[in-house]
Amino acid sequence: MTLWEKVKNLPDSPGVYLYKDEKGEVIYVGKAKNLKNRVRSYFQPPEKLLPKTRVMMEKARDIEVIITSTEVEALILEQNLIKRYRPRYNILLKDDKSYPYLKITGEEFPRLLITRRVVNDGGRYFGPYPDAGALNETYKLLRSIFKFRTCTPTIFAQKKRPCLNFHIKKCSAPCAGEISREEYFKEIEMVVDFLEGRGENLIKKLKKEMAIASDNLEFERAAKLRDQILALEKILAKQKISRGQRNADVVVVANRENLGVGLIFVIRQGNLLGQKVYTFTGEMETGELLNQVLVTHYGEAKEVPVEIILSTRENLDEEFLNSWFELKFGKKPKFTVPKRGEKFELLKMALENVNFTLDEKIKLNEKKQLLNEKALMDLKEALNLPVVPRRIEGYDISHLAGTGTVASMVVFIDGEPVKGKYRRFAIRSAANDDYTAMFEAVLRRFKKYLALQEEGGADGSFEELPDLVLIDGGKGQLNAAMDALKETNLLGKFTVIALAKEQEEIFLPGKKDSLLLTQDREGLKLLQRVRDEAHRFARGYQEKKRVKTLASLLEQVEGIGPKRRKQLLNKFGSIKNLREATVEEITAVPGITREIAERLKELLEME
């Protein structure tokens, strides 16, 4: 599905959109009152866009959206996602408008400030707050309750006597020693408790302290605590109980047409930090899918929230999940299925997002299936095949300067890779001869097929014949594969071709001239995907084998333990590089003495 096709399917809801580049990295985060209208505005003739926006859109390859209930939700989520991803074009494109935060400075006697800039300066930040007016009101009340200082560091350093703020009971005058650092920090800790949503707990704590002060006849302190409690209760009475005062995850699923999607909203300290999406294929009941999503997500997580909000508990394996959570985290979350209130609103928002994501993925799958079918029919016609090539196998050879030669076999069915059927072969014959290596790989693959036919048994990789075999290379590699098939008496049972990378020439057996398909042909694009996947798979195996060989050699050298072995592997990467390195270059690795380096060089010369 193209970017524009995705945009056409966007809803008219408020939400956040994330542009991604070809690597899948988030390059821009924006918010919208109407997602469809806002995102469409980027698709104008380039000359109508700002230069920076034009550059950003040239890089954009994909878009993800998170639907929110209100524009305010979108504002908060946008800020959190920008902090999380640090997208490069937000730094360039974001307008000067930003949302205010409360900041507790990292000074000896901290201040509480309202700021629109978040920097790594040792301070603690709370927010963002989309309603600046309400924030100013809260700030004034907090200042009247806790009496923290507001003066600049320069003025604070010069003060020897309390200023007017102390006399009108708006500052505790730490500059003049009217309050100890310990007592001042207790006040700041209470501010933190309040800002982190623990206002009720703070009031309970203050009431206990007030009772103790009263019992000890400390009436002045008890009166101060009483005033703080009354002011805090006034603030809390005005506040709507919000999800901002809890850590929770909302976990929802949707499934249709052999496709399942799980979505998690992560809410921490009052902020919706974003969503995590999981996709599953195959027939699955809703309860089974929900269990799978929970185990998959929390299997990777470092923490579990106090509460997990669900749309249903039907078929939820709570006994197993509770045991599993206890074992992994030492505690179990509370599962809730809200029917009304704020939690229900959150749940509705998550369900809207998961259904939108599922619809989008189904459309993408349908488009992919159509393109794959078009590519397969194109190949049948272009290569004059007797059947549509439902099963295509791709082969490639990889080695490093003639050593550690490996071959890969990848399998595509109906145009899609089936990774469970991939296989790799460590080449035993002439290591630095690509033709001999290709001959061996193809011969071994089809001998396995014949053995299965004769002896019975099952092997998803080898028990079926392909409709088409694609060899990475030119005529030489193609001829080697054909020779291998002659030995197995399978020649003519299916079609074999080679694809040479430089000109993307297709070589066919017995044909003098190569075949060239235009770059826009879906058939050629599919062949390129198969070839590139075979190449990637071979290189990955060859790399693992090379590192394993080097690690094995390093184990033989006295004085090189696991830590030094890892350092040498990271620095040199191969026996060839290590052999070419000087003793001085080897001793540059921490912990490698000249004596150890010389022993290693001696062993390398014997190899």
Curated annotation (Swiss-Prot):
Annotated ranges, domain GIY-YIG: 12-91
GO cellular component terms listed in the entry, alphabetical order: cytoplasm; excinuclease repair complex
UniProt GO BP: nucleotide-excision repair; SOS response
Keyword vocabulary terms for this entry: Cytoplasm, DNA damage, DNA excision, DNA repair, Excision nuclease, SOS response
Cellular location(s): Cytoplasm
Lineage: superkingdom: Bacteria
Molecular function terms, GO-annotated: DNA binding; excinuclease ABC activity
Annotated UVR domain residues: 200-235
SMART domains xrefs: GIYc (SM00465), HhH1 (SM00278)
Disulfide bonds: none
PANTHER family xrefs: UVRABC SYSTEM PROTEIN C, UVRC/OXIDOREDUCTASE
Summary of subunit composition and partner proteins: Interacts with UvrB in an incision complex.
Similarity-based family: Belongs to the UvrC family.
Role of this protein: The UvrABC repair system catalyzes the recognition and processing of DNA lesions. UvrC both incises the 5' and 3' sides of the lesion. The N-terminal half is responsible for the 3' incision and the C-terminal half is responsible for the 5' incision.
UniProt protein name: UvrABC system protein C
Species whose genome carries this gene: Carboxydothermus hydrogenoformans (strain ATCC BAA-161 / DSM 6008 / Z-2901)
Source lineage: Bacteria, Bacillati, Bacillota, Clostridia, Thermoanaerobacterales
